[in-house]
């Protein structure tokens, strides 16, 4: 969330930013409402001043045993007017807050300007995609042929975009999760969490999923929301708190299932594990001061890269352009892993610095010598587990339909080094 003072002082800049972000938030409506609010506030203050002066005059008249009925009657009308204007102020404030909550974060100056992913900037590549001497299969064909991924029964249980993992696939998914958490906690200093999978609306509002993306979230009958990422829960751990600067940065990680309606993705990735309503993810979250957040973003990207490098999966790092940037992010790097069956790189991690945008929404601050400042929050996939399984199955596949287990995962698989019939 942006500060109102900042919004008032940067209307034209924000109009340009919103255009570059493909956002249709109406800044002219904000300017009109803000101007109206100032008018109403001024009128309320004048009326309250008049009422206060009249109260003193009434007291003097009564002291002098003089009639004050005409003033009392007039002040009754003034009080009614003040009450009406206060109600109007509440209505105006709600409209301003709605605009404020729907304005995306201001992007970092280094962000490429462009309407869509075609304008993203490739930063670097790692690894060389393997050349197969046979036609590489898709992960869903490999999984179904081996009997370890069952999309038909997943759909029978829950509908489209659900899958049933069986045997080696279930074990490998668990191995991937444990491997990722071990690297992040034992080597990189993250503290592991197991968080709730359902949260209050105000928690989703804090990280920016609400109100803008409500249609993409699952809501329970008692107004709780299933988390679409554990970024939501971990970033909100310290909501409405003031931390000591010496405590920062905080490094948090968690595995969780994630639940997404995938609204607006009709027809995209309808087969396989790439786009599901329920999937597993290991998430990284950092809470930092304002000075160190961009250094911490680079470290977070490196943390995600470490997983891919240990798994020996070819990938590239791209910086997202203005039109492809997430709502709460000021700067984002995506990691895209190579998928042989698609002959292209696909997103497997997104690492973002949200600066003070989320912290301002959730009231998360840290102490400084002359008061307090809003924390900066960062989040990143470390990694999306199902997509990691996809990349392993496709990049490690063999001509006979089996696929190898990456060396670093063999100990987590009890010594199993190949998945076959």
Curated annotation (Swiss-Prot):
GO biological process: selenocysteine biosynthetic process; seryl-tRNA aminoacylation
Molecular function via GO: ATP binding; serine-tRNA ligase activity
EC id: 6.1.1.11
Residues engaged in binding L-serine: 229-231, 283, 381
First and last residue of the signal peptide: none
Assembly: Homodimer. The tRNA molecule binds across the dimer.
The record's note on its domains: Consists of two distinct domains, a catalytic core and a N-terminal extension that is involved in tRNA binding.
Protein name as catalogued: Serine--tRNA ligase
Gene encoding the protein: serS
